[in-house]
Amino acid sequence: MTFEVPTWDKIYGMLLNLAEKITDDKFKPEIIVGISRGGWPPARVMLDLLGNAKLANVSVEFYKGIADATDEPILTQPVSIPVEGCNVLLFDDVADTGKSLRLAKNHLESKRARTVKTATIYYKPWSILKPDYYEEKTRNWIVFPWERKETIRCLIENCRKEGIPIEKAKNRLADGGMDKHLIDRFINEILKEEQG
């Protein structure tokens, strides 16, 4: 598995491009819904870039760890505000399997949203749902700025289960662009947390 570790600045630039695509398409969402948890940060930025919309959330649980997903996502929190009759932009950070996007989209449609369009920063070619708007197609495992420590925690767990040295995982993350000092810091913090 190849990791890609985009910076905050790269993500912001990608969101600027996405906002331009949405504006050029003449789609004006009245509500932007971020899928918990990865969709929250980009949904908030998109609210700022597009303006004139309300921000809401929906919670879908899918991944247990890195590349370790349940078969089907579960809606754990319905949309937080009424969407009936509204144009809705549903946002997530990545369309990987596409199942969580599909589940959330179906949920919003069942709540009688007028139009539901989907947007993600990254799109993977095997996703069962191609977002209406996305910025980059990739096959890599994306490590977003808002989930780096969580990713390292999962990597440590996976390395232990598979008998792989943690050093190997560290090198793969560094090769993907994560700062080595940050990797070491998080590993040390996690190991201290485990010791109590």
PLM regions and their residue ranges:
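PRPP-associated nucleotide enzymes
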Residues: 1-196
